[in-house]
């Protein structure tokens, strides 16, 4: 970047690199870990931390009252995310840990394991290789705010806290139907999850503590403790109603666990809108520019401005514009580069529409260093596109635009003088649609993380969807489904 040249151009590669590799978040998390663990050799610790490459592995607490489905959700989540499933019981199953032996001695005496010891146990277990590399889902712990605070003091903090919830009467009815397989400890239910294998049915027994009175006592204890836990983890928690089919519950749990917390990293929006003609790209871009100060870059508009300003490039492309021909890509890219690399665009971000229209143009844009961090496809059926555009007319006197269905002319004399823009004839609209469909799939493959928005609804509803994806981080990518042998 040459500070002596005017106008000042900001190389786009710096911001793209920092955002693509999460440089800000890497440094922030590394400093957090150093301050929490306080290693004797912080330099080597940071090197090891970077080598582990485990900042994005799942770290999940799943809590809930009895019979809320904690075990089922934890198992499904671990299977889908390839994470380690932890419970207080299996944490105490180690036969080599001195801390486990100390905890077992309390249990042998019929005493509660102290919260401080629980925190050390969890810290020890979560420091093992499987939890570090694959992440973990901890079911049913912590149970109290004191335990949660002890975990925090030990440096154990979840990325997500899932709290399962349902009316007490539903939970009591569920709990009374619970059955346990005495051979492997698997949980079944007389109504919702009865095994088909007669051999398994014979192994099922009714667990202790599922009577209505005992379940009610456990529910009271849960309701007494959960407000404190929610206060402790207020920024990473979500309540999910489990009085619905369990796969619907799991879908909500998985969506939440894959979500990312809002980063403190500097974020400059670089937005690409594409879609069929008439999908509302220009309107959405103007709404974004109006609300957030993002620089609105319409490809067709900046080409016309270059011609009107009589720049050197404008003079070169003027014949193409006047004859309604496609401007060569290299000219378009040079003009767009001036806008995309301007100081205002680097400072406030940009929203681009009208370019690229195919993968060749997208590759040119990428080679120039301009990669969007949000790509939206405004989806609209061909019938709706043709209806929107072919019925659109303009009043040559006032310049006002009308539509035969959505905004008819107010008076008959206005209606009689309306004229149609030739590019909105049904034949030309269909030709533009054919060009769009010929390239849409390849463009989506090029950009991969394309966010599809249904554009056949109120434009402000569409804007709210777009806005929600801009102000929040994109969710984590879901790992491949494990294949059965």
Curated annotation (Swiss-Prot):
Residues 177-206 are annotated as: LID 1. AMP 1 binds at residues 140-143, 147, 218. It is an enzyme of class 2 (transferase). AMP 2 binds at residues 325-327, 354-357, 361, 432. Residues 298-327 are annotated as: NMP 2. Residues 87-113 are annotated as: NMP 1. It is found in: Cytoplasm, Cytosol. ATP 1 binds at residues 67-72. SUPFAM superfamilies: Dimerization-anchoring domain of cAMP-dependent PK regulatory subunit, P-loop containing nucleoside triphosphate hydrolases. Residues 269-471 are annotated as: Adenylate kinase 2. Its EC number is 2.7.4.3, 2.7.4.6. The keyword Metal-binding does not apply. Belongs to the adenylate kinase family. This is Adenylate kinase 8. The gene is ak8.
